[in-house]
């Protein structure tokens, strides 16, 4: 097909990682070597830097905060995300198990109340969370990976917060859409995001044909087990 499209494969970024795995690094040839232990002075210095960085992060009271989480690389977690995980009153997580896995890898203790907040319950839970915001609570919303609301939960609470006149902000970070776009080599001055393609071949082909007149760069999401078929359809 003639339309200029970019497929972004969405894999499982929430796998469990052991302490030993976190203490390994990959050489250029793909082999694994052990990271040398750092001395106490280095650890103390890093701890002081971390404390200074945390004190510089303001946690807004009475606010909904959408925070981006790492996509496969825990090193992409921002200082704001770390502080929010530690200090938010309520953490609304797409998958609580993955949240605690992320917190463990970051060395963070989640002090606030954690609730499951996903596609199947976000509309029902939005107003209850916003009632807490009205009392001054900081409600942190996180998805499994990337930015909430981008094919992830979060839209319902943002809409209701706007309707109720309550503040919403975000702690920016990784987003698969923008990462894929930046690395594609395709024009980025004008683009559109089309989310996931239809699962069935016939529906996918029909949908792609409607996009033929589109001259902007198009970004799609696709699952690993369907990405080859979708690429074939794009090339037809």
Each predicted region: which residue ranges?
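Beta-strand/loop-alpha-helix module characteristic of Rossmann-like adenine-cofactor folds
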Residues: 11-46, 61-63, 175, 179-236
């Amino acid at each position: 097909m003639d339309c200029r499209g970019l497929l972004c494969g969405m894999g499982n970024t929430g796998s469990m990682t052991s302490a030993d795995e976190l203490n390994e690094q990959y050489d250029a040839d793909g082999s694994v070597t052990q990271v040398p232990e750092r001395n106490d002075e280095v650890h103390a210095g890093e701890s002081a830097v971390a404390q200074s960085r945390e004190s510089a992060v303001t946690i807004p009271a009475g606010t909904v905060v959408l925070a981006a989480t790492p996509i496969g690389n825990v090193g992409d977690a921002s200082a704001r995300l770390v502080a929010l995980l530690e200090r938010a009153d309520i953490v609304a997580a797409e998958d609580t198990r993955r949240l605690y896995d992320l917190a463990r890898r970051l060395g963070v203790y989640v002090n606030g109340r954690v609730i499951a907040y996903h596609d199947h319950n976000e509309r029902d839970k939005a107003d209850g969370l916003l009632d807490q915001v009205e009392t001054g609570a900081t409600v942190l919303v996180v998805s499994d990976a990337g930015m909430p609301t981008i094919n992830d939960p979060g839209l319902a609470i943002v809409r209701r917060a706007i309707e109720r006149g309550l503040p919403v902000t975000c702690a920016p970070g990784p987003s698969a859409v923008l990462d894929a776009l930046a690395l594609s080599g395709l024009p980025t001055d004008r683009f559109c995001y089309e989310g996931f393609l239809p699962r069935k071949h016939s529906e996918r082909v029909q949908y792609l044909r409607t996009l033929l007149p589109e001259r902007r760069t198009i970004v799609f999401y696709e699952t690993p087990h369907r990405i080859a078929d979708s690429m074939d359809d794009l090339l037809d």
